[in-house]
Amino acid sequence: MATIDLQKKSVKIVLEKKQLTKVTARVGLVLDITGSMRPLYKNGTVQNVVERILAVADQFDDNGLLDVWVYDNEFSRLKPVSEKDFSGYVDREILNNDRLHKFGRNDEPPVMKDVLRKYVTEEPSSYPAFIVFINDGGCKKSIKPIIEASSDKPVFWQFVGIGNGNFDFLNKLDTLEGRVIDNTNFLHIEEIDRISDDELYDALLAEFPFWLKEAKEKGIVREQEPPAEKPKKKGFFSRLFSK
C-alpha cells in the first residue's frame, strides 16, 4: 500500500475517534520558508509535511485539494496540491520556482491576511477552514490582532512549531483574550519527521472538534446538511413491473 494511502487510513481512524467523519472542511497549509528552514526544504522534510497534510485534506476537504501558501518577509499563494500531483511538489512549485521569494526573514501577518482573504472574502462557504500553519520559531506578536479579528470567522488556526526555536508567543495562544471564541491551537513538534502519522493526526485534530462545536453554537459555522442521496436508476424489470 502506498504511503499516502496509509496516511489517509490513519486520518480516517482519527476522524472516527473524534466523531468528525461527517464534517467537511477546507484545508490550508501555510509553510514557513525563512532562511532557517532551508535545510528542511533541501532534505525532503517539507515535502513529507505536504504529503501528510494532503492526507488530511483528502479525507476532510470539500474537493480533496490542499491549498498551500509559503511565506518569509513576502508570501505566495501556490498552486493547490492533490493526490494526482503531490510527488515532487516542493521541488517543482517551490525550490525550482525562481519567481518565488524564499529564505528571507519571517513576517506572518501578510500571509494570514491572505488566508482570510481567500476563505472569507473571495470564496465564502458554509464549510469551515482548517489551517495548518508551520513555523520554526520567532512568530511575531503582530499576529494577535489578526487572530482576534478572525475569531468570529469560520477559520481555525492550528499552529505547528517545529525545531527548537522561540515559541514564546505561540505558547500563550490559549490565554489570548479579546476573542469571540478560541480559534487557535499550538502544537510543538521538535522533529516532525520522527513523529508517527497516528500521533501527528491525533495532535493536529485535538482542538478542532471543540472549536467546531462552539462555532456552530455561536452561528459562526452553519450546520452541514448530509448530502442528498441520488435516486437509484430503475432496471429493466423494475420499469416493466411498475407499469
Swiss-Prot record:
Residues 231-243 have a biased composition (Basic residues). Residues 26-204 form the VWFA domain. It comes from the Bacteria. It holds the Pfam family vWA-TerF-like. SMART domains: VWA. Residues 222-243 are annotated as: Disordered. PROSITE patterns: VWFA (PS50234). This is Uncharacterized protein YcbR. It comes from Bacillus subtilis (strain 168). The gene is ycbR.
